[in-house]
């Protein structure tokens, strides 16, 4: 996390210095991880033609920051070399403490282990000097307005203030609004709303939920408590027909009457009676 913060602060300051009108919204964790991986492969020796492809790096940065390709290659190389030295110093600082504890736990068998604390002391002094240079670097390249943000938000770090101010393109009011709303910038930012005064804090979760429901949602509580029981459809009364063609249908008042059409004699002759003939026996 510390290495990513160093990379993000250095890139933001570099782009803001050479491209003041550039859109920094494309700089995210993906490009920071890419730069960190590229610089990790370089090592403390810095960039060279064998281990660093300037064209590929410039093309990648151009995709995230339009106009990055117009920056001179020498300026980009100096920034890469300086940032590589800062990262190597930070890595040495992280590795010194585990190595020193491991050396103290070992038993001195030969004269070689006895000389290791002196080497560690020299590495510690060199890493401390690199760390001081690293700390002095961002302070020299602070964006205008960072001191105001740090004064208003004491819990905000320098990297966070630079990130928010770069996102706001130097607009101090917009940067303050972003800090109040708690918009996260660098990966390790836990949010600035922890120790802010009540008037500068953003709305809490429950308050925000109730506000949204009150403003945008219409809830009819009386209507929700009602139980809707639809009425059963009423049956239509039977329509009784008593007369058809001026004749009484029946005394019961049925609706329909079986009306048979008269058939011709030729049609009747075609009918076949399938029932067997009835046998009559006379005694």
UniProtKB/Swiss-Prot annotation:
Protein's GO biological process: negative regulation of cytokine production involved in inflammatory response; negative regulation of macrophage cytokine production
UniProt keyword annotation of Phosphoprotein present: yes
Keywords: Cytoplasm, Nucleus, Phosphoprotein, Ubl conjugation pathway
Domain CUE: 141-184
Region of interest called Disordered, as start-end residue ranges on this chain: 87-139
Modified positions (Phosphoserine) in chain numbering: 110
Origin superkingdom: Eukaryota
Nucleus keyword on record: yes
Biased composition (Basic and acidic residues): 115-124
GO cellular component: cytosol; nuclear membrane; nucleoplasm
GO MF terms, alphabetically ordered: ubiquitin binding
Ranges of biased composition (kind: Polar residues): 87-109
Pfam family, one: CUE
Chief place of localization: cytoplasm
InterPro entries named in the record: CUE (IPR003892), CUE_CUED2 (IPR039805)
Main function: Controls PGR and ESR1 protein levels through their targeting for ubiquitination and subsequent proteasomal degradation.
Subunit record text: Interacts with PGR and ESR1.
Written domain comment of the UniProt record: The CUE domain mediates interaction with PGR and ESR1.
The protein's name in its UniProt record: CUE domain-containing protein 2
Lineage: Eukaryota, Metazoa, Chordata, Craniata, Vertebrata
